[in-house]
């Protein structure tokens, strides 16, 4: 399990390939990459600034990863989240799950993203034509996370 919160850009393909390296027991790797969009809620977005709570954010991500590891037979799990200034088209987040079988990898990846969106302390501020604005959580994110508690 690896958790990284960083300002530096990353290569999603390289991250995905690294999950499989030196582990022949892996039969499936599922990855998710989230990108900065150039629009949100009908507004053009010129960029984004991501803030986090150092120490607390990593701890929250570690807890999410640990719970995923308890629920599914994962061989590897990686969570990488960027902070700082990001431009449209840049990757924000990578979640990679590796398992012997695909269903565990798919389910774990969905779970991690659903919980990351609702339980990890990140704050997004978008630059729009009307000026900067903080992005609020979506009800759909809460509903997605809720399904794992049933």
From Swiss-Prot:
Gene3D superfamilies documented for this protein: Molybdopterin biosynthesis MoaE subunit
Pfam families: MoaE
Cross-referenced InterPro entries: MoaE_sf, Mopterin_biosynth_MoaE
Binding sites annotated in the UniProt record for substrate: 35-37, 101-102, 117, 124-126
Domain of life: Bacteria
Entry's EC annotation: 2.8.1.12
Cellular component annotations (GO), alphabetically ordered: cytosol
UniProt pathway annotation: Cofactor biosynthesis; molybdopterin biosynthesis
Keywords assigned by UniProt, alphabetized: Molybdenum cofactor biosynthesis, Transferase
A GO molecular function held by the record: molybdopterin synthase activity
GO BP of this protein: Mo-molybdopterin cofactor biosynthetic process
Subunit structure: Heterotetramer of 2 MoaD subunits and 2 MoaE subunits. Also stable as homodimer. The enzyme changes between these two forms during catalysis.
UniProt family annotation: Belongs to the MoaE family.
Entry-linked PANTHER family: MOLYBDOPTERIN SYNTHASE RELATED
Function: Converts molybdopterin precursor Z into molybdopterin. This requires the incorporation of two sulfur atoms into precursor Z to generate a dithiolene group. The sulfur is provided by MoaD.
The protein's name in its UniProt record: Molybdopterin synthase catalytic subunit
Taxonomic source organism: Pseudomonas aeruginosa (strain ATCC 15692 / DSM 22644 / CIP 104116 / JCM 14847 / LMG 12228 / 1C / PRS 101 / PAO1)
